[in-house]
């Protein structure tokens, strides 16, 4: 859930029927080629939420690089919310009337309307399932215990002021810490923070263990890559070192599986959002066990279940691996996490 804050400063009296509005196009529901989209409006606790989604959701259906999801529900929440079409938008602009009955095949929008001079809108995305993790379908961390996107929006609305205060307090702390380094470092750190946090998804496996999984954009779309985690860790070493453990946990888990029959750390866990086994450095052989298993340059696609294969499968080309880099990354991350105060249990479990 995200906030869009606004305040109106009129150059005179506002008309009695003034409003502030925000809208989203149906393109948020699919990747590339236009698809059938449906939607509606939810009456909630003191506000409304309009939503739309692909008519046929294909959850976690694409592991290609640099793509938008072909699944999930997109929301706008405001005092009043609408699902409208092109024709409905034109009618609203020309005559001030809202058509809440879009026709089939019309291009859809969701619209939020407030009638206060100062306020905020909420936009939200419910991916329904966030990560496939070696046989487990995992939801976003907030949804543990049966919570829904409605709970997330209700919470974000009820705790709006408190959340913004926490953000302001953290921002002040970050600014103070960055001032020790030098002028301009705070601006750089703000950009790095947004990139690092935005690149990761937080989920929890069936054992109750945290997983903080990155997506490696413009580099095969790999998930949980050790050499992406490594440059991401400074922020979390400072403010939440347990998230560094959560970055490493997947590498440890996959390294113990029979298909990974090496004594060094793997590079990745698959391609986002599928943790189904490392995809980097696979062996291309012209035999019946390998030929046709891997395709390059094809999109959309989903991963094969490499993690279930026995050691004899010989899936990987050892000449394409990075043992020094990945082991170095993991050793430094684990030592740094412990030094920063993370739970030592993960290290004890994996370095007996």
Outline where the language-model segments fall.
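Acidic/polar, glycine-enriched structural segments that form the non-catalytic walls/loops
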Residues: 9-224, 241-245, 252-258
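Mature, folded catalytic cores of secreted/periplasmic enzymes
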Residues: 6, 49, 330-332
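Aromatic-rich carbohydrate-recognition surfaces in CAZymes
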Residues: 10, 115-119, 138-163, 221-352
């Amino acid at each position: 859930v995200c906030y869009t804050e606004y305040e109106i400063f009129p150059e005179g009296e506002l008309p009695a029927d003034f409003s502030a509005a925000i809208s989203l196009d149906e393109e948020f529901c699919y990747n590339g080629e236009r698809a059938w989209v449906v939607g509606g409006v939810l009456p909630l606790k003191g506000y409304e939420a309009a939503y739309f989604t692909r008519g046929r959701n294909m959850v976690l259906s694409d592991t290609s690089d640099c793509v938008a999801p072909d699944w999930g529900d997109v929301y706008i929440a405001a005092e009043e919310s609408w699902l409208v079409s092109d024709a409905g938008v034109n009618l609203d602009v020309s005559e001030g009337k809202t058509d809440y009955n879009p026709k089939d095949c019309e291009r859809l929008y969701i619209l939020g309307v407030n009638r206060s001079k100062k306020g905020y809108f909420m936009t939200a995305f419910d991916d329904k399932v966030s990560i496939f993790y070696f046989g487990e379908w995992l939801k976003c961390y907030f949804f543990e215990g049966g919570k829904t996107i409605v709970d997330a929006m209700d919470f974000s609305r009820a705790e709006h002021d408190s959340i913004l205060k926490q953000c302001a307090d953290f921002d002040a702390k970050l600014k103070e810490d960055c001032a020790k380094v030098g002028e301009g470092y705070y601006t750089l750190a703000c950009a790095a923070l947004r990139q690092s946090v935005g690149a990761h998804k937080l989920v929890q496996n069936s054992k109750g263990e945290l997983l903080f999984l990155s997506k490696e954009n413009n580099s095969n779309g790999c998930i949980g890559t050790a050499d992406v985690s490594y440059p991401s860790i400074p922020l979390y070493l400072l403010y939440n070192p347990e998230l560094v453990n959560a970055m490493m946990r997947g590498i440890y888990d996959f390294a113990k599986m029979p298909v990974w029959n090496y004594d060094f750390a793997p590079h990745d866990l698959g391609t986002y959002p599928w943790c189904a086994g490392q995809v980097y450095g696979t062996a291309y052989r012209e035999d019946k066990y390998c030929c046709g298993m891997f395709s390059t340059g094809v999109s959309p696609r989903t991963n094969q279940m490499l993690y279930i294969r026995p050691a004899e499968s010989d899936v990987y080309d050892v000449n394409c691996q990075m043992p020094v880099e990945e082991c170095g990354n993991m050793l430094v991350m684990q030592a740094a996490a412990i030094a920063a105060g993370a739970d030592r249990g993960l290290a004890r479990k994996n370095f007996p």
